[in-house]
Every structure is written in structure tokens, then in C-alpha cells.
């Protein structure tokens, strides 16, 4: 195989929401939310009963989604969604509940692909009556499409009508509510034509921002500019105001028009209507410098209509919500009112549901669902009304800005949270827990809501009850007494010499009149038929009827008089099969009268039976037709239970080891059959391997066997229910759960103690729980969410984290540097308070006493920084030490260095700067601060500070010394008594050193704008020499060495690429002991003498913030793990065989043709957004193969000379074998 080939897999999708719409997309009364997360569209369905949000659908569009808008045709009951993307096309999607998919209804091309400033797609607005839509670009271009129905009542879309305005920058577009008059769109725009022709710059300073109305004349099929009015030059957002005459209620819905949100003010504007303006109350901040104060902007808004009224919620950039109401007489406005409502995280989108919920799509971090407790009408907070000011507040003299102090939630209460890692600033995969797979330690979040997270692959478990038992049970069951019971009534525990029966009520207590035999251990418990119970014990079967009458069946005796025992059994609601120690199977079936009848013949197996299973009886059927039996000759046999071939053998499968447990379960997997559940036969082996095979419902043959190693312990399987669906638990050295999520079968470990046995549990206080045994302890627990496969353990941080470093010897100990711009540090707050010269009363302190985690840090002017260094125990999830930085010093880099000159003592070095200006990058002073680690690294002690000449952006340990990227210089420092000693430097780097990695004496340097530069340290001459670089300039964010000659790097535009040095160049550099030959080589293309060649290139679509070479599964190959700024986690898996490369690249090319992007983006062009994709296969695209129709799957598989099942199996092996996800 020539060169390197990689397979890209997304392990955790982006969590950053950039667009949100609400509507009745299913066509029912229930409202749903569609959110855009990078290249992914998700349909969320809030449960109005529980207040939980379920992710119903997640679809990768393979294109950048820029905007969303929902509309409904007049008289329709179903909402459609319009998508603006980087495809140069407008796309209308319809949600199909039957297939749980988004279907493309219309796709119209209007421009070039890519996110360009004059190609529409950035802004979308619809007419409130669903008659037209406007799609706009950042500059000049605006198109209007008419939406209508044809004779068959299908949605139609017209040709585009141009509403272009040359030399105009567009800031926002919104549809104006005019009832059934000609559709009207409002645009916020700036004309720069005069600025282009004025060399003095005066026209640029005086450029006016205008509110312009564009009218679509439905009669003439033409768009005209109807009205234009200058607005505040700092206006940034338009909000639609209800309007139009309501024929049903015989009254006006509202005054129509728009609210123009600008800095500190909100203004109502409409043609031929008086202006009304209200101020946006500002937070009371006594230490703010009023001369440098930055005004308050509105960043999100939502309109909510009720039967006879409407109101708006608008949100400022601090997260404060304000309620805006209007008084109007018919279609004329009387007054505009504003009032503080509550404070929530800053949102990219707000949605109010009719059921009384507010969905907050947070700009950073988790998405939140709140419930309205009240509408804030009855509290004593002041309300500001436009009529209280001169000229309704719209005169030349603007209303004075009132102040307020935010308070904890009063009108809202949080009911659900959808966790998100967005943004990830830095991450490290390590394994301090010594688990099967590494944990990812990530620095996430922004501002005071930041956190340091330990991410573990698995489902989170919430424990409800933990109780000690008198002994160690071998098994546990729960059962209802009758079929109609809503909840379980009994918990049955089997011990070596007896059985304990507990009743489930307000308390759990022992019962003696259950009818069960308690003097013997139990093998199985089943609720049988309508109202009977069944107990299988080693010496027989006990059938307990509803009137407590007991029917017994005893095991038969052998010819020598010894009684046989039951060694294995399986049951369902209507059937019972037991295996005797004489290697015979005995079959029982429930008749229509509720009697349990034994089938006359017994089946001799010819080998000892170890385990067996049959699925639940299908609804409306008398019996299930198949039984799986595992024997001690390492085979599994499928036995028929049909009346005409009872206990006849159908098929046999050989195993690599004897079976320890079998579980048959009917579960839905859309990659196998999207319409019906598939019968899976799960076989756990004694060597810790799990086999999953499919039982052919017609022939009874076992097909498509997949294997997975679970641990060193024999596997025990239990059929259970999770979130109302069939699931299978596999118990080995870890507990695993097989379940269906979004119509795909998942197999994920539980983050919980190792269970010895488990069963489903349903009680009034815990309706969807599970019960398990850990040693002699009984545990009752729930799985709150199946949506996320990563369990998050968090430590709260004070400011935005910048970099993390781990202690090399103390497992799980990390150091985080945090820095926040435009924020006052505690020391600066104290100094400014003292400068006021007076004691502030409680009501005057305003934001000084607020909790930053809830309300955000105290805002300050540009150039103010708050920063700290924190030692974190990642495993225990606690801060062990925190060091606040003062004097406007901010930390940007960190490294743990074992200095050779100090007998390998581990020191912490932090790179920081004072009075940092971000653009252009500058600082007053910069330092490398060295800390001694005390208490095994849990505390820090300042050793000394070393002043340097630029901001240290990256630090790294290197051969017992410190390697530092300080501005354009790369330096090596050693430890001195009073400061760090500069030993060596190279100042030839073009922009700034932002990333470093090293092997031996070779160093790879990531430059801020000029890609990767290879350097070598020559100890004889104590010299750092650069000898190779990249041909193309790239804005590097991270780099890591894959081997001595190969480096993987990522840039600011979402690309990952791999560079490799020529072998001869590499050898000649190493063979030159002084570096003099390299120094005198002729530079090529104004750079280094040698050029690295590009091996692989791929557009991920997210800015990469960490790159690491690591093995994700025990004994698995190493992969390149990356994390993205928007919360995504992915892996690039290297291929090991040419056959796999050929198969999957052919599959990828077929899927590019078959699987059209729902936004109309060409897949190859998307993955080659900045440079052509090279040597990387898109695993996310390949995995959509299972979602194609069976006919398409067969056609593509035929081209590859394979069956669809084999391709799905290969894709699953690549994902599970390399990443474990």
C-alpha cells in the first residue's frame, strides 16, 4: 500500500447551535424544534408531560448550515423548513414521521457554492402567512421566492425574483406581518457606494444605516423597494411585530412593522406610523468607567402570540431577558413597554412553545429548557414605557438609561438540560483510571460557566437505591402479579440454598404468602398468561394461580431412581422450556384456559445444556417459533417450537468456546430492516467474547455473526427494557447495554459498578428503572438519557480555559491556565471600589455581589484581564489549588517540565503577559513563571519569574529543559536559581509560534500563519536550525508528530492535514552534527531549503483544538484523536490493508452519487473546501450506507462483490475496533 490512508470518524457531533426554528413539522398538534449544529440538522421533541427534550432525528447534511426558517402554507397543518447553506442552493425540507427522515421537497440553485459574501444563504426570512421567502447574502444579493400549491396540493416554488441592491451591506432580514396584503420584507442595510469613491474617508464615517421595506407584488410578480428610513448606525437586529386584520376575531392582530434593536435602545418603526423608543436597562455596575462603557446589544429575540395578546422576549449579550409589550388601537401603536424578566445563558436562538416552555439554544455550553411559572406581570420591578418620554422617546434627546440588578430565576424554572462540550479549548486523552479505554480530559466552556471535564465512553447511570443483603444472591428478578399491572409487585432474589421474595410498595419488605418455594434456589421467574406466576427451581416448576392455588411439576427420575435436576431454563409469557441433567429438553405451553401443558416428547440433546433462550411471545400470537440452546460441546442449536415440528433441530453453529449465556431479543435496526424488528441471538461465551447473530425468521438459520471482546469474565446476558424499548444487558468485567437509538442498534458500556446480575424494574417512583446485584448489595438505578455516549464529570472553572498540562507521575492531576478578556479580576474590583472613596450600600453594589457562574463575570473595558492557574484532580473532580493572577496579568500557556539540572524535579512553567492587546498582538511585559510543586503536585509555590520580550503562546518539555515559543522566537531555557536561563534561540519564524512537538532532537513548529516548520537541535553547537517547511501557508492551531518524519496538523479553517519529510533529507539532517551544512543550504521559495510533501488532507468542518496519537481500545491500533472548538470529537483511523482502502474508497464514491446531501452540497467539494481531499475516506458518509433503501444497498454491494450485511459489518468493525464508540 503506497502512502498513508486514513478513515475519518465523528465520535461526538458538534454541540454548537447556530440556528433554531420551531414548528409542527410532523403535521400533528405537537410543536418540535429543528436546530442546526455545524453540518448537522437535529429534530428535538420536548415532552410536555415530563419537561424532557428528546432528540428524534440527527442528520448530517455534509454542508455548512448558515440559516433556517420555518413556514406553513395558508390553510395547511404542517410546517416546512427552509435551509440556507454553503451549497449555493435554496432547499425546502419536509419531515416524514413514518421514516423518521428529512425529505428534500425542493432544491433551487441560485449561485456558487461556498460561504461567500455575495452569495445568498446567510439570511432567511419568510412571510408570516407562508406565501414567500427572502434569502439574502452579506452583501448586495437578495432573492425572493413565491411559495404556493399546485393542483395536487403539493408545495411549489417560483423562479427567483431579484431584490439586489448594489453596494449594500446587509445586517439583518425579517418578514413583516401585513396579513394578506402583498408580502413585505424588512432589511437593515448600509449603502457604501459613496464611501468607495471618497478618498478622504468622510463618507465612510457618515455612511447611514437604513431600514428598507421590499414589497413583493403578487399581481405583477415583481419586487419593489417600497420605503426606506435611516436608523441608529449601531442597529443590529430586527424583530417582527404582529399585524394584519384577523377575520375570525374581527380585530387587528397588532400594529405591524418591526422593532429595531440598537445599542442601548429598542425602537418601533413602520411606514406611516409614529416612532416609539424605549431604553434597554443596563446592569448597575458602580466600578464601571462610564467614559469607556460599551453599550448593550440585543442578540436574540422571540415573539409569542396568544389569543388576544402578544409579547416579545429579547436577550442582551449579558444573558438578561427583557419582556416587551405593546399597546395598540387597531393597527396603530399607542405605547411600547420594556421590563426585566430573568437571566439565562446567552443564546443563539430562543423558542417559546405553546405548552409553556422556553427553549434556550445557548451560544456556548448546554442547551436548556425552562418552564414558565408566570409572565412577570405581577412583580414590583419597574416597567419603562415610551409614552413617559418626550416624543415617545424617539426625539433627538434620547431617554436616559435606567439601571437594574439581575436576580435569580423567578418567572422561569429550568426543567431540562441537553449537555454539550461546546467549546473545547484543549484536551488530553489519558487513562488514570486504568480502564479498557482512555478518558478524555477536556477544558470546555467560556467565561464563568467554563468547566474541566473528564469524559468517559459509556452511558451515565443514576442510582436510586442501594441496599445491603443478608448474603450474596446469584440472581434477581422482578415481576408483576397480573398482565394488566402497571408496575412490578415482587423482587425475587435467588441464593445458594433459598429464595427471598420482597414486595414493592412504599417500602420494600419480605413477603411469605407469594406462593413461591423459598427453601430452594430459583432458576427463573415469569408472569405467565393473564394472572399467574411461574417459578422454575432445580427440582421442578411451580405454577402459582391468581387464587394462590399451586400446580407443581417435578423433574422425572432416572432408571436408577435418582431424580434429575433442571440445569437451564428459559420462559416467556406463554412458553416454558427446561433442560434436565439427563441432557433432555422438556417443553411446556400455556393453553387458552391458562393451563400449563407439557409436550409429550422430550428432546435428547446429546450434549450437556449450558444455557438457552427464546424471545418474548409476539403480540397476538400463541407462541414464539424458535428456541436457542447452548451446549457444552461449544455449539448453539436453533430448535423449532412450531406445533408441526416441535423440538426439531433447525440449525447449528459452532463456537470458539462454550456458551455461558444466550439471549434472544427482537430489536429494531434500520440498517437491517427499517420496517420490522429483527430477532438477534446474542451469545455470551465463557472466554468473555460476545457474538451477535441474526436469526432468519423464515428459515431459522443464523447469519451475519459479529464478535466483540467484553472482558476476561464469562458473559452473562439479560433481556430487559430501557426507555420503553427492548434492550439486552451484557455483564462481564464491565456492564454493557445493547439498545436501539434513532433506529440504529447501539452497544455501549454503562459507567457503573460491575454487576453480577440485573433485571428491569418498574415502580411508581422509578417507572423505567433497572435492578442489579453487586456482591451482597442490591442496586436500583436508571439510565436518564440514551442520547449521549459520553459521561461527563465536571469541575467548575472561573474563566475561559486556555491550555491544560498533566503531571507525568501523579495520575489524573492536571494544571489549567484560565484567562478572560474584558473582565475585572478580584484585585481590580477591590481597587476600583476603594477609589470610589465611600462605602457602598447593599442596593448600590449591583453586579458586585452576583454569582458569576449564573450571571457572568463583571464586564470591563478592553485591555482588562482576569486570570488564574488551577491544579485539578480530574479523577476526583475537585480543585486542589488555585492561584489568582493580579496586575492585569493573563496566562496563555503552561507546561510541566522535569528539569535535568534540578535532578529531574518536576516544575510547572506558565507563560503570561501584562496589559495584553489582542489586535494587533502586543503586551507591556511578558513572563515565564516557574512554580515548585508541593504535596505530590497538588499545591504550587512560586520559585521565580523570568521576563521575556513577547507573549509565550506555547511551552513544552524538551530533553530535561524548557522549549518555548515566544512570539516569533523558539527558545530553549534551563532552570536557574533566580530565573530561567536562555540557552539557545532561533528567531527566524515568520509570524508566531503557536504549537510544538518533538521526538529526539527533532522539533516541529506550528506557525500562526505559515504552516509547519521542521527544526533540529544540535547540542554540539547548541544551535536550533530550521531545515524544512510546508509549501502552502496555513493558519496552524495544533500539530503532533506521528513518527520521526511525519507530522499531523490542523488549521483555523477546519482542515486536518499530514506532512511527511523525504527520507534522504531526514537522514542528511541527522548526520550533520553541527548543522552548518543546513545553515548554508540555499533557501527555496523564501523559506527553508527542503519542503515537506502533503500526504493527506481533509476538511473536518470544525476548528481543531487538540490532536493526539492514542489507542482508544485495549489492544487496538493507534488513531489520531482530535477535538473541535464547537464540541466535536473525532478520530482518523489508519488503514492497515490495501483491500480495505479499495473497498471503502469505492463505497465512498458510490455514496457520493447516491446519497444526495439534504442541503444540496456536493460531498467531494465540501470535504475539499480549502484544498482537495487527499488519502482520507469519510467514515461518516460510508456509515449512511445502512440508511439507503434495500434496493440501493444491494446495487452498491453488487458493485463491490459483497452483500450489504458484509459492508455494514466491515463499517461497524472499523468504528468499534479502532475507537470503541
Swiss-Prot record:
Transmembrane segments: none annotated. GO terms for molecular function: U2 snRNA binding. Its main location: nucleus. InterPro entries: Beta-prop_RSE1/DDB1/CPSF1_1st (IPR018846), Cleavage/polyA-sp_fac_asu_C (IPR004871), RSE1/DDB1/CFT1/CPSF1 (IPR050358), WD40/YVTN_repeat-like_dom_sf (IPR015943), WD40_repeat_dom_sf (IPR036322). It is found in: Nucleus. Keywords: mRNA processing, mRNA splicing, Nucleus, Spliceosome. Coiled coil: none annotated. GO terms for cellular component: nucleus; spliceosomal complex; U2 snRNP. The keyword Nucleus applies. GO terms for biological process: mRNA splicing, via spliceosome. Belongs to the RSE1 family. Involved in pre-mRNA splicing and cell cycle control. Associated with the spliceosome. This is Pre-mRNA-splicing factor RSE1. It comes from Mycosarcoma maydis (Corn smut fungus). The lineage of its organism: Eukaryota, Fungi, Dikarya, Basidiomycota, Ustilaginomycotina.
Amino acid at each position: 500500500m503506497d502512502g498513508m490512508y486514513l478513515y475519518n470518524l465523528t465520535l461526538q457531533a458538534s454541540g454548537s447551535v447556530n440556528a433554531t426554528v420551531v414548528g409542527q413539522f410532523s403535521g400533528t398538534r405537537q410543536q418540535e424544534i429543528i436546530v442546526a449544529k455545524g453540518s448537522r440538522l437535529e429534530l428535538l421533541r420536548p415532552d410536555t408531560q415530563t419537561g424532557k427534550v428528546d432528540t428524534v432525528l440527527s442528520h448530517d447534511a455534509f454542508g455548512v448550515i448558515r440559516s433556517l426558517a420555518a413556514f406553513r402554507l395558508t390553510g395547511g397543518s404542517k410546517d416546512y423548513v427552509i435551509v440556507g447553506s454553503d451549497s449555493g442552493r435554496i432547499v425546502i425540507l419536509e419531515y416524514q414521521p413514518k421514516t423518521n427522515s428529512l425529505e428534500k421537497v425542493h432544491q433551487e440553485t441560485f449561485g456558487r457554492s461556498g460561504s461567500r459574501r455575495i452569495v445568498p444563504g446567510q439570511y432567511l426570512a419568510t412571510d408570516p402567512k407562508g406565501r414567500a421567502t427572502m434569502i439574502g447574502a452579506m452583501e448586495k444579493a437578495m432573492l425572493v421566492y413565491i411559495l404556493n400549491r399546485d393542483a395536487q396540493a403539493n408545495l411549489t416554488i417560483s423562479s427567483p425574483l431579484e431584490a439586489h441592491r448594489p453596494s449594500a451591506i446587509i445586517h439583518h432580514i425579517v418578514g413583516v406581518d401585513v396579513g394578506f396584503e402583498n408580502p413585505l420584507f424588512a432589511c437593515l442595510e448600509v449603502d457604501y457606494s459613496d464611501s468607495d469613491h471618497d478618498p478622504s474617508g468622510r463618507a465612510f464615517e457618515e455612511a447611514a444605516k437604513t431600514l428598507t421595506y421590499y414589497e413583493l407584488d403578487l399581481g405583477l410578480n415583481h419586487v419593489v423597494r417600497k420605503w426606506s428610513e435611516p436608523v441608529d448606525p449601531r442597529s443590529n437586529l430586527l424583530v417582527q411585530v404582529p399585524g394584519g386584520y384577523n377575520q375570525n376575531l374581527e380585530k387587528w392582530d397588532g400594529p405591524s412593522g418591526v422593532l429595531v434593536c440598537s445599542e442601548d435602545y429598542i425602537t418601533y418603526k413602520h411606514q406611516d406610523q409614529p416612532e416609539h423608543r424605549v431604553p434597554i436597562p443596563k446592569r448597575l455596575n458602580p466600578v464601571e468607567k462610564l467614559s469607556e462603557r460599551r453599550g448593550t446589544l440585543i442578540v436574540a429575540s422571540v415573539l409569542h402570540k396568544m389569543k388576544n395578546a402578544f409579547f416579545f422576549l429579547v436577550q442582551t449579550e449579558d444573558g438578561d431577558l427583557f419582556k416587551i409589550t405593546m399597546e395598540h388601537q387597531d393597527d396603530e401603536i399607542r405605547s411600547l413597554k420594556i421590563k426585566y424578566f430573568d437571566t439565562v445563558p446567552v443564546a443563539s436562538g430562543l423558542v417559546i412553545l405553546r405548552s409553556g416552555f422556553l427553549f434556550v439554544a445557548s451560544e456556548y455550553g448546554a442547551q436548556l429548557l425552562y418552564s414558565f411559572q408566570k409572565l412577570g406581570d405581577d412583580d414590583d420591578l419597574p416597567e419603562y414605557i415610551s409614552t413617559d418620554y418626550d416624543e415617545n422617546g424617539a426625539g433627538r434627546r434620547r431617554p436616559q438609561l435606567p439601571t437594574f440588578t439581575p436576580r435569580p430565576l423567578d418567572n422561569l424554572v429550568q426543567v431540562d438540560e441537553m449537555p454539550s462540550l461546546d467549546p473545547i479549548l484543549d484536551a488530553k486523552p489519558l487513562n488514570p483510571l486504568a480502564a479498557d479505554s482512555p478518558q478524555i480530559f477536556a477544558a470546555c466552556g467560556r467565561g464563568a460557566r467554563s468547566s474541566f471535564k473528564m469524559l468517559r465512553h459509556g452511558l451515565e447511570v443514576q442510582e436510586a437505591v442501594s441496599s445491603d443483603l443478608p448474603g450474596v444472591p446469584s440472581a434477581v428478578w422482578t415481576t408483576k402479579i397480573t398482565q394488566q399491572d402497571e408496575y412490578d409487585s415482587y423482587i425475587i432474589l435467588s441464593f445458594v440454598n433459598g429464595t427471598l421474595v420482597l414486595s414493592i410498595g412504599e417500602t420494600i419488605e419480605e413477603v411469605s404468602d407469594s406462593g413461591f418455594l423459598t427453601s430452594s434456589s430459583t432458576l427463573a421467574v415469569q408472569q405467565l398468561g393473564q394472572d399467574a406466576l411461574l417459578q422454575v427451581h432445580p427440582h421442578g416448576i411451580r405454577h402459582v394461580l391468581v387464587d394462590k392455588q399451586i400446580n407443581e411439576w417435578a423433574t422425572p427420575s432416572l432408571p436408577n431412581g435418582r431424580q434429575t435436576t433442571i440445569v437451564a431454563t428459559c420462559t416467556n409469557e406463554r412458553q416454558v422450556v427446561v433442560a434436565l441433567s439427563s441432557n433432555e429438553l422438556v417443553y411446556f405451553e400455556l393453553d387458552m384456559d391458562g393451563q400449563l401443558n407439557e409436550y409429550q416428547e422430550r428432546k435428547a440433546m446429546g450434549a450437556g445444556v449450558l444455557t438457552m433462550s427464546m424471545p418474548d411471545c409476539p403480540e397476538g400470537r400463541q407462541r414464539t417459533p424458535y428456541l436457542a440452546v447452548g451446549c457444552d460441546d461449544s455449539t448453539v442449536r436453533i430448535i423449532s417450537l412450531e406445533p408441526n415440528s416441535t423440538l426439531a433441530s433447525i440449525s447449528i453453529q459452532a463456537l470458539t468456546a462454550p456458551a455461558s449465556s444466550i439471549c434472544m431479543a427482537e430489536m429494531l435496526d434500520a440498517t437491517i430492516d427499517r420496517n420490522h424488528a429483527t430477532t438477534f441471538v446474542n451469545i455470551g461465551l465463557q472466554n468473555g467474547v460476545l457474538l451477535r447473530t441474526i436469526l432468519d425468521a423464515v428459515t431459522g438459520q443464523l447469519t451475519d455473526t459479529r464478535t466483540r471482546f467484553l472482558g476476561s469474565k464469562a458473559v452473562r446476558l439479560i433481556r430487559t427494557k430501557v426507555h420503553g424499548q427492548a434492550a439486552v444487558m451484557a455483564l462481564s468485567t464491565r456492564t454493557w447495554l445493547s439498545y436501539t437509538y434513532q433506529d440504529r442498534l447501539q452497544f455501549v458500556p454503562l459507567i457503573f459498578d460491575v454487576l453480577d446480575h440485573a433485571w428491569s424494574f418498574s415502580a411508581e417512583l422509578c417507572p423505567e428503572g433497572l435492578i442489579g446485584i453487586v456482591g451482597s448489595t442490591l442496586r436500583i438505578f436508571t439510565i436518564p438519557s440514551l442520547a449521549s455516549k459520553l459521561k461527563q464529570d465536571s469541575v467548575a472553572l472561573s474563566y475561559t480555559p486556555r491550555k491544560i498540562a498533566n503531571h507525568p507521575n501523579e495520575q489524573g492531576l492536571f494544571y489549567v491556565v484560565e484567562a478572560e478578556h474584558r473582565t475585572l479580576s478580584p484585585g481590580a474590583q477591590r481597587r476600583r471600589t476603594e477609589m470610589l472613596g465611600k462605602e457602598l450600600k447593599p442596593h448600590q453594589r449591583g453586579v458586585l455581589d452576583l454569582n458569576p457562574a449564573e450571571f457572568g463575570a463583571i464586564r470591563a473595558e478592553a485591555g482588562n484581564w482576569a486570570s488564574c492557574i488551577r491544579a485539578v484532580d480530574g479523577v476526583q473532580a475537585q480543585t486542589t489549588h488555585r492561584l489568582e493572577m493580579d496586575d492585569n496579568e493573563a496566562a496563555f500557556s503552561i507546561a510541566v517540565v522535569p528539569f535535568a539540572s534540578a535532578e529531574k524535579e518536576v516544575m510547572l512553567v506558565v507563560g503570561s503577559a501584562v496589559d495584553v492587546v489582542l489586535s494587533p498582538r502586543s503586551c507591556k511585559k511578558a513572563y515565564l513563571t516557574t512554580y515548585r510543586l508541593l504535596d505530590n503536585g497538588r499545591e504550587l509555590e512560586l520559585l521565580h519569574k523570568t521576563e521575556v520580550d513577547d507573549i509565550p503562546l506555547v511551552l513544552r518539555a524538551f530533553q530535561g529543559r524548557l522549549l518555548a515559543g515566544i512570539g516569533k522566537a523558539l527558545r530553549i531555557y534551563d532552570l536557574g536559581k533566580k530565573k530561567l536561563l536562555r540557552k539557545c534561540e532561533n528567531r527566524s519564524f515568520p509570524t508566531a509560534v503557536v504549537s510544538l512537538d518533538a521526538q529526539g532532537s527533532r522539533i516541529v513548529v506550528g506557525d500562526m500563519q505559515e504552516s509547519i516548520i521542521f527544526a533540529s537541535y544540535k547540542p554540539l553547537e547548541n544551535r536550533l536550525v530550521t531545515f524544512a517547511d510546508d509549501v502552502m501557508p496555513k493558519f496552524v492551531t495544533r500539530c503532533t508528530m506521528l513518527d520521526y518524519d511525519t507530522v499531523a496538523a490542523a488549521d483555523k479553517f477546519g482542515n486536518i492535514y499530514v506532512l511527511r519529510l523525504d527520507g534522504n533529507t531526514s537522514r542528511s539532517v541527522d548526520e550533520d552534527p553541527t548543522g552548518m551544512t543546513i545553515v548554508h543550504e540555499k533557501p527555496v521559495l523564501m523559506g527553508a531549503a527542503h519542503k515537506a510533501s502533503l500526504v493527506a488532507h481533509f476538511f473536518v468542518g470544525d476548528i481543531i483544538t487538540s490532536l493526539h496519537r492514542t489507542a482508544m481500545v485495549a489492544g487496538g491500533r493507534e488513531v489520531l484523536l482530535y477535538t473541535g472548538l464547537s464540541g466535536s470529537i473525532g478520530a482518523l483511523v489508519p488503514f492497515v490493508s490495501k483491500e480495505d482502502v479499495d473497498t471503502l474508497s469505492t463505497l465512498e464514491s458510490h455514496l457520493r452519487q447516491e446519497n444526495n446531501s439534504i442541503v444540496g452540497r456536493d460531498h467531494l467539494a465540501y470535504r475539499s473546501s480549502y484544498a482537495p481531499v487527499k488519502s482520507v475516506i469519510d467514515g461518516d458518509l460510508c456509515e449512511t450506507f445502512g440508511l439507503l433503501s434495500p434496493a440501493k444497498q444491494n446495487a452498491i454491494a453488487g458493485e463491490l462483490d459483497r452483500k450489504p450485511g458484509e459492508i455494514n459489518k466491515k463499517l461497524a468493525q472499523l468504528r468499534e475496533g479502532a475507537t470503541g464508540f
